[in-house]
């Protein structure tokens, strides 16, 4: 409602402006006002998320907030998302894994697959970012302390429970973004989540997301997200995690 009111006010100001030369200034001021209003909405919404004990399932409201933030950000930066193969994704819960090339990867995938309510396991450091960290937790993303194996096991168990309840959860097996574009060694334990949840394993390949920051505002960028394969549970049920990891690696590099 606030956005609608401000939008109508801006439209009125543009239409009634006695000096056409002022219209660009009014427009730029309007964009700034909308941006500040959106930041205020995010800041207020973040206050309702307990960083120490967030709701393990998250809330659709916060996922919509992320989508409402990422969409304009991509448009402003002249970034286009090319999603290929989404029709392969199964109904119900599944584990999504893929390569990790940029800090933008999780939110880009969440935005592209926003109709599926996708959330991610994210490193603990991301959840300590002012305002954004609480929004991330509020959306249902799970905080992982990479230095604590016991906490990591607890997170995997949470992933399993949520997938069994029909959710789509994403994990980057590399554990961190690759600065060279080449796949890093996998942390094989994450594949256990698909075996324990008895769910399909979807493989998502991300291309050119590392160019977003480099090209932002300067030139158009197309980020390609390709669902390369969906491995049914029956195919991975009796494999060890190293075998699953090698299969995923082959899929991502072909």
Locate the predicted segments by residue.
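Structural motif corresponding to alpha-helix initiation and N-cap regions
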Residues: 83-86, 129, 153-156
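Residue-level "edge-of-site" marker
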Residues: 87, 149, 207
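Generic preference for hydrophobic
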Residues: 83, 96, 120-121, 225-227
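Short acidic-hydrophobic, aromatic-tinged amphipathic segments that line or gate anion-handling sites
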Residues: 83, 142-145, 233
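Membrane-anchoring hydrophobic helices of lipid-metabolizing enzymes
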Residues: 1-10, 18-93
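Non-catalytic C-terminal accessory region of glycerolipid acyltransferases
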Residues: 20, 153-254
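Catalytic core of membrane glycerolipid acyltransferases/transacylases, capturing the structured
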Residues: 46-67, 75-76, 90-148
